[in-house]
Amino acid sequence: MNIISVGVNHKTAPIEIRERISLSEVQNKEFVTGLVSAGIAHEAMVLSTCNRTEIYVVPAMHEVTGEYLKDYIISFREAGKDVRPEHFFSRFYCGTARHLFEVSSAIDSLILGEGQILGQVKEAYRIAAEVQTAGILLTRLCHTAFSVAKKVKTRTKIMEGAVSVSYAAVELAQKIFSNLSMKKVLLVGAGETGELAAKHMFAKNARNIVITNRTRSKSEALAEELGTNQVLPYESYKEHLHEFDIIITAVSTKEYIISEAEMHAAMLKRRLKPVIILDLGLPRNVDPEVSKVQNMFLKDIDALKHIIDKNLERRSGELPKVHAIIDEELVAFGQWINTLKVRPTIVDLQSKFIEIKEKEIERYRHKVSEEELRRMEHLTDRIMKKILHHPIKMLKAPISTSDSMPSRVDLVRNVFDLEEPNQSH
């Protein structure tokens, strides 16, 4: 009863290789249903994101190994000779479970603690469940992974603290001003970085966001998406600097777009009410001399990266707690797997003893009285339970490092001459 995981991720393969292995939702469904319908797997699921494509399989044949699955997906995607087995990782049994628990907990992510991955794991399971390729094992594995991720999020700080420049900027603004809903924000630049910063601001309850961009249509599109519908002409935004508590700049330029003199004038109009400028440009958008203006807080990318590094360091310090949670859940999952493995043997063992008992009782059915027969049945039941107690207890006991469940099952089946079980997995 094995579970195999095989795949490529940011640790094992460069992006050009990962791109050639990735699966769309349609391809995902075709792949997993193909594995099951061909009798290659009892169960199958694929997790495919920008950073990883991972296959989770309960094999239906002894020939289905990690190497087999690597070759299978390379062929399925027609990935070419450049994609080789060494670009893949392989995990088996509890190693597969540990890997999925680590992925779901965001400690195997490109950015430690990046919380988006859990939603992607849930989506992978949804697809497999929808096409009915997630059976009892993968269903239990995934739901345990979801539980692990929830415990990690609530019991540790692995996901706390900004680890992107745009989010770090917003987090810093919130620390300075506390309630962003009461502040007026100017976003200069509606490119990818500016858009992310605006969306993070909106998520932190900032609603009074004004956008300016060289191309007005981009300003209007972002403002409409946020629901603010507030834009300023790029040519005249400097005339309004004094109106804003928070200014975020994210434009591509070789010249400073805000000078010390401009901010000094703006601060006089504000009567020195504090302003924070978050310069997300590279090269910098704001003259560093602006920081000399009274009540002006200027933070550029280097300052924000220092915050990010500190946050990542704190997240790394939470790893022992995360691993402890994973270890705890891994033991519970392993014990559940073991109960599935031993259940047929326990049933067969009990059935064999009941059959022996009934045959022996039948031999005396017409030789003794009904009362004596009842006593014999009662006595043989007690003897049978005492004989079976130890082997059943041994089968149910936790696995030690020097033991294995298959060896226990084989031992009991051989000693008591039980036929090989007919199992679906």
Curated annotation (Swiss-Prot):
GO terms for biological process: chlorophyll biosynthetic process; protoporphyrinogen IX biosynthetic process from glutamate. Pathway: Porphyrin-containing compound metabolism; protoporphyrin-IX biosynthesis; 5-aminolevulinate from L-glutamyl-tRNA(Glu): step 1/2; Porphyrin-containing compound metabolism; chlorophyll biosynthesis. Gene3D superfamilies: Glutamyl-tRNA reductase, N-terminal domain (3.30.460.30), NAD(P)-binding Rossmann-like Domain (3.40.50.720). Keywords: Chlorophyll biosynthesis, NADP, Oxidoreductase, Porphyrin biosynthesis. It comes from the Bacteria. NADP(+) binds at G189, A190, G191, E192, T193, G194. The active site is at C50. Belongs to the glutamyl-tRNA reductase family. Possesses an unusual extended V-shaped dimeric structure with each monomer consisting of three distinct domains arranged along a curved 'spinal' alpha-helix. The N-terminal catalytic domain specifically recognizes the glutamate moiety of the substrate. The second domain is the NADPH-binding domain, and the third C-terminal domain is responsible for dimerization. This is Glutamyl-tRNA reductase.
